[in-house]
Amino acid sequence: MADAEDSRHSKNEGFPNTSLITEKLDLLDLFGSPKVKTEREGRPARLLEGLSAVNAETAFVKTHPLQHEWTLWFLKPPTQGLEWSDLLKEIISFKTVEEFWGIFKTISKASMLPAKSDYSYFLKGIRPEWEDPQNMNGGKWAYQSKHKGSNLDELWLYMVLAAIGETLDPTGKEVTGVVCNMRKGFYRIAVWTRNCNDKDVLEKIGLRFKEVLGISDKETIEYSAHEDSSKAGSMRAKTRMSL
């Protein structure tokens, strides 16, 4: 389970492995993050310029392993006669930088997904469901915005890179995955955690989450526990923290 609305449906200092990808590829500052929203403008161009220069057939001579293996998941829009678990599809797992880019450049952009569908990147072995043993005691930080006129695809890429580069969590133990929910009229990007009670750690993850997305102080992200979301059903789960 991943979405209550569907009724079932700073710098890197102090963070482990913060330069995992940038040190090894030395292509561009993938994890550089603005402090305010207005600073986003230059980032997509720099990022996409770097991406266009990366050709998996010619640029990579050797592979660069990630610290952990990750899995891409896709949640299909609701279909009559199918349970939620039947709509959730495990797409592919990867454990190197090169494998990730090959996958990311091949699949559809998040902005092109139909309403009520999701992309998720989770540590291998963890399903993007509230009921998964690694998620059931946790929760999520979520940022929600209207889809029209946004730079969703770039923001989602920043979030995925921060997740697989393991720069979101100062402990290296809390983050289980990241999710992009496409909904009618808006999208939501979220980072999931194993536990929901360590406020100090959660606050650090939340601040890093805002930094990666370049969210200004005028915008708010909210943290909710999966337990509360499961009880809320179609209603919105109560917010435990906000930044």
From Swiss-Prot:
Highest taxon of source: Eukaryota
GO MF: RNA 7-methylguanosine cap binding; translation initiation factor activity
PROSITE patterns, alphabetized: IF4E
Cellular component, GO annotation: cytosol; eukaryotic translation initiation factor 4F complex
Alphabetical list of Gene3D superfamilies matching this protein: RNA Cap, Translation Initiation Factor Eif4e (3.30.760.10)
Gene Ontology biological process terms in this record: cytoplasmic translational initiation; nuclear-transcribed mRNA catabolic process, nonsense-mediated decay; regulation of translation; translational initiation
Keywords, alphabetical: Initiation factor, Protein biosynthesis, RNA-binding, Translation regulation
Assembly with partners or alone: eIF4F is a multi-subunit complex, the composition of which varies with external and internal environmental conditions. It is composed of at least eIF4A, eIF4E and eIF4G. eIF4E is also known to interact with other partners.
Function: Recognizes and binds the 7-methylguanosine-containing mRNA cap during an early step in the initiation of protein synthesis and facilitates ribosome binding by inducing the unwinding of the mRNAs secondary structures.
Family: Belongs to the eukaryotic initiation factor 4E family.
Protein name: Eukaryotic translation initiation factor 4E-2
Species, as recorded: Schizosaccharomyces pombe (strain 972 / ATCC 24843)
